[in-house]
Amino acid sequence: MSNTNAIQTQNEQKYVGKGEFVLYLMGVFFYTTMTGMVGGNRNAYLVNVLRLPEEQTSLFNLLTTVIPFVLNFFIVMYIDGRRMGKGGKFRPIAMLVAVPMAIVMILSFWAPPGLSGTILFIYIVTIAVLWGVFCTFGNSINMVANVMTPNLKERDRVLSFRSISSAVGNSAPVAIVLVVGLIWNKDNTELINAVTGTSIRSVEGLQYIISAALCSVVGIITVLSGMKIVRERTVYTAEKKNPLVGFVDIIKNKYAWTIIISEFLKSFRGISTFMEAFIAAAVLGDISKKILFVLPVGIGTAVGMLVINFLLKKFDARQLYIASGIYSLCANCAAFGIGYLYFTTGNSILQIVFIVFLFLIGLQFGASNLLPSMFQADVLETIELKTGKRFDASFPFVISVGTLISGTIASTVAPLLLYGDGSIIGYIQPTDLVPNPVQSLGTKVTLLFFYTIMHGIMMFLAGVPFFFYKLTGKTKEEYHEAVLKQREEMAQKQA
């Protein structure tokens, strides 16, 4: 078969079966449920359950961002340097880390009785660093989508639904924690402490531990099942090269820089994400009611991703990403205005309107969650065409250099903005005597500003670099066909 016919066949043939597709998405969904459980609740656990002072919370966020980043530098070189065996390159890694990752997730919401002060701080930092390391290895489950099929349209379809599964899975812990909170109360917590001799510090702490345990069990089963059935079908060289050269190739790629700058700017929205649990507590009187904020946003996200998936048939990804940034700024500003009126008047109709606007805010996540993975997959092919190597782990790491800087700034500054002496927001921490303290109007409004307008500004700025991004349409297809030709020649040499 000629190279031309082989390339045409690869662009037309369907490789991924329905069973493989469904089980893979289930694995991704529950893997992201595990990461979402920690990402969405750990800050609230530190502040409301362990009662860390703001200085320790900021230091914790700084250390648990920087230390895993340094370790990840070596981990991604190991992953990209692995030879593709019979089981593939990424599948075995995802299967190996599923169980230890689940265990560390549970430990992220449990502190041994008697620990306090410096010893407690060292413990939670150690667990968080381990969690970060396992997440880097576990992210191999997402890399599998890039190599499941050489068919460009089928690859984009897999990436689209993988992103949808990730987004919905990331929101699932909110519902899980809520349901657990409805079942377990203060009496249950005291009973468990008495029977087991443990020291779970609050009902909220019990919610997190039980929720983490549920996520871990289901996560292990689905990740192992999904990774057992999927196949990696992309052919690429197994030649060993200096991994540092790969980083240089990525940095030299002009298309890569668009994504690097965009993700750098977008990660400042971590300040907004940090505020989510606390605005729920401030506005609704109970942090467990966070679902009233998160659920409309989550539904909007799922709908938004389906809408983006449909619009990709008529518009290119670049246009949709830029438009999404503009929409995000407008929707968040409108939500702030409605929220402000609600806080100052207490009108129940405005409360309903505000919830609707939370749904509208969620729509913009459709683009921000779905399209970056496609951009990265396209850029990886331009690098593969030049070098013959794939850098599925190294490229996200290079992107993370920028997000490390902006994310570290965001996670370090956010607690200082939120509470403590001299904070801008003035959030009052709960205590044993006052578990749900009343927050002032100024606190609620300022929290809302950082939760909405701050987020909209950063999403708008994240779209600006894509005004200069040209790897779309015909250019994207030409690169893909050239890569398929290169892979076919490589396969013939290896045969």
For the regions a language model picked out, list residue spans one by one:
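Membrane-embedded alpha-helical bundles of multi-pass transporters/translocases
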Residues: 3-495
